[in-house]
A protein has these predicted regions:
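Catalytic cores of RNA-modifying enzymes
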Residues: 16-236, 256, 273, 278-295
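Primarily a LysM-type cell-wall glycan-binding module
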Residues: 241
Length: 295
């Protein structure tokens, strides 16, 4: 494939000759918005990767799309080609100004706000939507916890995050990467680790590799246990992940006098990374019953 270099100020970027002018225009404007370390901004500069990320939303057709942290719109421009209702949330006022100037067709749908503080039910009038973006590393886990809190609104979430976080989300039981995010997300979503992205396609380059994932709501409507207790147990036992459950669960059971059979259950000699989502549901029901019958 034939490529050529475009030199824009301090940045030397690669663009394919077949890229239409608007996309090359984006590259030559890279210097107009300064990436801000406090916001965890790493602007993607590879158009092929941007298009590949945009294409991941096709798995959930016919519903609106919400992009988080569009920056200067390298992903936005490809999402706009999807002919779907698109809104973008950007906390950086400089980026909002740039987006309004260069994407006038999207101006009414560019929201200058903090995604983590927003009421998502108001975004599309209560309609479901796809969540996507080149997510800031610093808050990616918080974004996914908010997704879980709004899972009935978000049947599909795609995008790019730190590779280590993506590996945790997609990890299976028995793997050292398996943890809180793995269990809580896999309880409600099917997870696909799509591809890895190298550091050199960002400005500034991050110190770690990135990855693109897709999470699609599974058929689970009810876990079959107390969901609040389920989350509490998952977070508690992974907080002491190297200890057996009979040790870490004492933080939840406290001084309550429970039946001896509870502590003799076969799962008590296992560690949290050895339990599947279904086994965590079973454990939650076991703990729930023990707490209710405790003296």
């Amino acid at each position: 494939m034939i490529c050529h270099s475009i030199v824009c100020g301090r940045f030397k970027l690669m663009a394919h000759l077949f890229c239409p002018p608007p996309k090359l225009h984006y590259l030559c404007r890279m210097k107009t918005v300064r990436p801000k370390k406090n916001l965890g901004q790493h602007f993607l500069t590879d158009l092929n990767i941007a298009k590949a990320i945009a294409d991941t939303v096709d798995a959930c057709p016919d519903i609106p799309v919400l992009e988080i942290g569009p920056g200067m719109g390298v992903l936005t421009q490809f999402l706009m080609e999807k002919d779907r209702l698109l809104k973008a949330v950007e906390i950086d006022s400089e980026s909002v100004e740039w987006l309004n100037s260069h994407y006038p067709a999207l101006r009414e749908n560019i929201i200058g706000d903090d995604f983590l503080r927003m009421d998502l039910s108001r975004l599309f009038g209560g309609r479901q939507f796809v969540l996507t973006g080149n997510y800031p590393y610093d808050i990616s886990s918080q974004i996914f916890f908010k997704m879980l809190d709004n899972k009935e609104l978000i049947p599909c979430c795609t995008g790019m995050i730190q590779r280590e976080v993506a590996q945790r989300i997609a990890s299976a039981p028995g793997n050292k990467s398996y943890g809180i995010l793995s269990v809580l997300i896999q309880a409600w979503y099917d997870v696909e680790y799509l591809f890895t992205v190298n550091e050199n396609v960002f400005n500034p380059p991050p110190k770690v590799k990135s990855a693109v994932i897709r999470m699609t709501r599974n058929s689970t409507e009810n876990l079959g246990c107390d969901e609040t207790l389920f989350k509490r147990i998952v977070k508690t036992v992974f907080g002491q992940r190297r200890k057996m459950l009979r040790v870490s669960l004492r933080q939840i059971m406290g001084d309550k006098a429970v039946a001896p059979e509870f502590w003799q259950h076969e799962c008590m000699t296992r560690r949290p990374e050895q339990l599947s989502v279904a086994e965590f549901v079973e454990l939650t029901n076991l703990v729930d019953a023990a707490l209710k019958s405790a003296v």
